[in-house]
Amino acid sequence: MTPHINAPEGAFADVVLMPGDPLRAKYIAETFLQDVVEVTNVRNMLGFTGTYKGRKISIMGHGMGIPSCSIYAKELITEYGVKKIIRVGSCGTVRMDVKVRDVIIGLGACTDSKVNRIRFKDNDFAAIADFDMAQAAVQAAKAKGKVVRVGNLFSADLFYTPDVEMFDVMEKYGILGVEMEAAGIYGVAAEYGAKALTICTVSDHIRTHEQTTAEERQLTFNDMIEIALDSVLIGDAL
């Protein structure tokens, strides 16, 4: 047990899928896993363990923002022996060639947060995904006939940012999606010797203002979830 996770030792699989919303974690577990058991519920940050096509996998929410997700990722790795974390979440986009409901595999994550500079002695840390996990996700998408975008994310500290000019900079540098956690999770994984990947579904277009509802974000991002789950099986074979 930790101050934030009340699961017993051995309750989590070595691979954990982490959406931000704990209700989305519940939906994923109940929809895609078999033999599901709720293993933690502190602060209503729900976590579940079950099997997917016979493979033990856990699902747990991580909340919003780098501080929240970093706490859960660190404790899962150091206290429960988790080896791989796949963040499955929503993101916005500023690019006109990226559409709402597109799936993005985050090879790297830029950020305006200082957390990785703090852990990396005030130097820039390249927050990147594990290559094998990213490759497995691309293979899983291709096997399902799904088109995915692969590239950089931007993990923002402010959801309601006053710096709208930064969106132009993001677009210039080819940022595919804007979210709030990937850079933190990649930093935690690097610090504690684990592996991580972020897969996002575009829920909002910052330029056109097209967006999905909260219910759609919870229930209809199934392509992303299936890609993540199948990537675990592919990764086991690599």
Swiss-Prot record:
A purine D-ribonucleoside binds at residues 4, 179-181, 203-204. InterPro entries: DeoD-type, Nucleoside_phosphorylase_CS, Nucleoside_phosphorylase_d, Nucleoside_phosphorylase_sf. SUPFAM superfamilies: Purine and uridine phosphorylases. GO terms for cellular component: cytosol. The active site is at residue 204. GO terms for molecular function: purine-nucleoside phosphorylase activity. The record marks 217 as: Important for catalytic activity. Phosphate binds at residues 20, 24, 43, 87-90. It comes from the Bacteria. Its EC number is 2.4.2.1. It catalyses: a purine D-ribonucleoside + phosphate = a purine nucleobase + alpha-D-ribose 1-phosphate; a purine 2'-deoxy-D-ribonucleoside + phosphate = a purine nucleobase + 2-deoxy-alpha-D-ribose 1-phosphate. GO terms for biological process: purine nucleoside catabolic process. Keywords: Glycosyltransferase, Transferase. Homohexamer; trimer of homodimers. Belongs to the PNP/UDP phosphorylase family. HAMAP family: Pur_nucleosid_phosp (MF_01627). Catalyzes the reversible phosphorolytic breakdown of the N-glycosidic bond in the beta-(deoxy)ribonucleoside molecules, with the formation of the corresponding free purine bases and pentose-1-phosphate. This is Purine nucleoside phosphorylase DeoD-type. The gene is deoD.
